[in-house]
């Protein structure tokens, strides 16, 4: 029943999103005339080689209108982004509900483990579709935007992806990509599933063994302080794996769509680090351990 109500709400939101996209285009078309007027006024001023009181007054009015138009378009786009975020949240809730229903449905045969190539593609898609944080003028990026860690009292929700420190088969410890199943306030412990085992490998871990992954990409052009900087020590997901390893930032992203370039610690190389490899913002988190000498 919950899945049906989620589906109907998603359909409503998609309709609302479509209307907002149409409004954006209408607003843009409406403001186009004013922008053309600004350009023509500047051309006339250059031709006459002077700024008369008439042109000064006219431009002030045109720019005031342009600013109002831009703010109106911006407000519509923000509403559209909110709709997209709500749709993604509902889709995630639906996925978790379906997963739980599958776990407790004894009448169905067990699902086959996802092929590794499919899993890697899904991880790449998750990184690409991570929303870019777009604040209003003067806003500071929130926790879990880029390199900004979660607040001290933050509790990751079921379905959230995290870096989790677990014991490997050999007894060593490693950081894996995991999905939160639940959190107990009584014990202050998480239950998480190894993402590579699709729920077959479940771990109960204390808070200090969990690092929530970023929920927004940081924009290097507007919020560079929300990114890890060159030579900063991090944990990064090694390409084509589901494990995090220590690495140094080689180059931070320069544009919103760029990845980090990182140097993984690797004793097989003379200087102790691998050649530069690209890792998406989604899969780079702070490393609290000291840097190796």
UniProtKB/Swiss-Prot annotation:
Gene3D superfamilies reported in the protein's UniProt record: 2.30.30.140
Coiled coil: 3-86
Biological process (GO), any one: regulation of RNA splicing
InterPro entries from the UniProt entry: SGF29, SGF29_tudor-like_dom, Tudor_SGF29_rpt1, Tudor_SGF29_rpt2
Signal peptide: none
Record site feature (Histone H3K4me3 binding), residues: 238, 245
PROSITE patterns: SGF29_C (PS51518)
Domain SGF29 C-terminal: start-end pairs: 152-293
Region (Histone H3K4me3 binding): 264-266
Record has NAD as a keyword: no
Keywords: Acetylation, Chromatin regulator, Coiled coil, Nucleus, Transcription, Transcription regulation
Residues annotated with N6-acetyllysine modification: 288
Subunit structure: Interacts with dimethylated and trimethylated 'Lys-4' of histone H3 (H3K4me2 and H3K4me3), with a preference for the trimethylated form (H3K4me3). Component of some SAGA-type complexes. Component of the ADA2A-containing complex (ATAC), composed of KAT14, KAT2A, TADA2L, TADA3L, ZZ3, MBIP, WDR5, YEATS2, CCDC101 and DR1. Interacts with (methylated) CGAS. Interacts with TADA3L, GCN5L2, SUPT3H and MYC.
Function description: Chromatin reader component of some histone acetyltransferase (HAT) SAGA-type complexes like the TFTC-HAT, ATAC or STAGA complexes. SGF29 specifically recognizes and binds methylated 'Lys-4' of histone H3 (H3K4me), with a preference for trimethylated form (H3K4me3). In the SAGA-type complexes, SGF29 is required to recruit complexes to H3K4me. Involved in the response to endoplasmic reticulum (ER) stress by recruiting the SAGA complex to H3K4me, thereby promoting histone H3 acetylation and cell survival.
Protein name in the entry: SAGA-associated factor 29
Organism, as annotated: Mus musculus (Mouse)
Higher taxonomy: Eukaryota, Metazoa, Chordata, Craniata, Vertebrata
Gene encoding the protein: Sgf29
